[in-house]
Amino acid sequence: MAESVIEKCTEQVSNRFKLALLASQRTHDLNTGASNPVQSARFKGHKNTIISLYEIAERQVDTHELFSLLVSRCKEYMKGNLSNTYSSNTSKLEKLLNFSNDQFNTDADVDQESTDIQDDEVENEMSNQDSEDIDDEVDNEE
């Protein structure tokens, strides 16, 4: 049964990868409530993925419209990721640049040992922030 639906779908959409993307977009629309199944009584009890494939196979949805919705959704996603990347880098830069004057000892009597300790503390803080950034990027990719 599912194989015949896929065969019908490939008659409508020649590329199987594009078919998967279009079915994904249609399923997303159904899951979010953006639209209802065209024949809701017929598909009662079916999962939205199967409903999407049936609708594509039977030409009940416009594949060109689905593709344009998919492209716009991808663009929004990329804009969100890019703005998050830039905003997080900006906030890290602000943290590094906004040290208060009390954090730096400007006395001329400071010996080299205390300066080395402060340098080590700053390097540790920067490496901790870098490791947190890597962890955040890994979490976002998952």
From Swiss-Prot:
Return the Pfam families for the record: RNA_pol_Rpb6
**What is the stated purpose of this protein?**
Promotes RNA polymerase assembly. Latches the N- and C-terminal regions of the beta' subunit thereby facilitating its interaction with the beta and alpha subunits.
Oligomer and partners? The RNAP catalytic core consists of 2 alpha, 1 beta, 1 beta' and 1 omega subunit. When a sigma factor is associated with the core the holoenzyme is formed, which can initiate transcription.
Top EC class for this record: transferase
Per the UniProt entry, what is one GO biological process?
DNA-templated transcription
Keyword annotations of the record: DNA-directed RNA polymerase, Nucleotidyltransferase, Transcription, Transferase
UniProt xrefs under SUPFAM superfamilies: RPB6/omega subunit-like
The keyword Amino-acid biosynthesis is annotated on this UniProt entry: no
Q: Quote the catalytic activity from the record.
A: RNA(n) + a ribonucleoside 5'-triphosphate = RNA(n+1) + diphosphate
Q: Which residues form a coiled coil?
A: none
GO CC terms, sorted: DNA-directed RNA polymerase complex
**Protein EC:** 2.7.7.6
Its recorded name reads: DNA-directed RNA polymerase subunit omega
Acidic residues composition bias: which ranges?
A: 108-142
Organism for this UniProt entry: Wolbachia sp. subsp. Brugia malayi (strain TRS)
Family as reported in the entry's similarity comment: Belongs to the RNA polymerase subunit omega family.
Q: Which SMART domains does the protein's record reference?
A: RNA_pol_Rpb6
- GO molecular function terms attached to this record: DNA binding; DNA-directed RNA polymerase activity
Q: Where are the annotated segments for Disordered?
A: 104-142
